[in-house]
Amino acid sequence: GPEEALDSRRSIDGGNAYALPGFVDSHMHLESSMLTPEHFAQVALSCGTTTVCADPHEIANVLGIEGVRGLADACRSLPLRVLLTAPSTIPSAPGLEDSGFDVGPAEMEALLDIPGVAGLGEVMDFNAVAAGDERMLSVIEAAANHGVFLDGHVSALTGRRLQTFRAMGIDSDHTVPSAEKLREELALGFTVQVQECMLNREIVQAMNDAPVQDRICLVTDDVPLPRLMRQGHLNFVVERAIELG
């Protein structure tokens, strides 16, 4: 016969409404939408996204710590849950651009102390990490000492250089161009974040065949406003993955 109902610690009256799971976008950039956080939240929620993990490296590249603090303040009261990461690679191309800010270990400590900052933003200078650059490694170490997750960007690395990146504690990558690279990163313990632009039948098949499903997720990365309004947000990436198998 039917089992007895379980006792609950808390009961919530849904008022004849439906309870549905929401999408979590674990790697994205709010600035790409060209919207204020408030207006982005309206669009994202209408597409089923309830949580985003945003790397504000464009804001930090211009306004530094105060820019990230201002963004955190603007996101705090939104109906959309926004977790920020501390931009790690500012400037993104040292010596090749004029930047309004420079992130070293002291600046990283200050960024991680901002309420709402939950991790290290994508480490884009993979060549510096692979070469053992002291400044870049000290930024990563500062974040690791806070016990936060460490986001990566390692599209060009394979083999020993990719292993070095993982050994530094980098947890994830969202630049997976092939099924072979996806399998290699999963084997090394990365969380693999797959963007819509990287989805194809080979990658989707590798995702389906992967022995570790809970370290694969779909993300948006950058969604310009016209595409956001025309296609949606993370829901479009999910729909595309389903279409591909």
Question: Model-predicted segments: where are they?
Answer:
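Histidine-rich, glycine-flanked metal-binding segment
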Residues: 1-21
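His/Asp/Glu-enriched, well-ordered alpha-helical/loop segment
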Residues: 208-245
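Divalent metal-binding pocket/active-site signature
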Residues: 121-180, 196-198
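Hydrophobic faces of well-ordered beta-strands that scaffold small-molecule active sites
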Residues: 22-30, 52-54, 82-86, 118-122, ...
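Glycine-enriched alpha-helix->loop->beta-strand junction motifs that scaffold or abut catalytic
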Residues: 49-50, 116-117, 147, 164-172, ...
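Divalent-metal coordination cores built from histidine and acidic residues
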Residues: 38-147
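Di-metal (Zn2+ and/or Mg2+/Mn2+) metal-binding site signature of metallo-dependent hydrolases
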Residues: 17-41
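Divalent metal-coordination and catalytic microenvironments
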Residues: 16, 27, 48, 71, ...
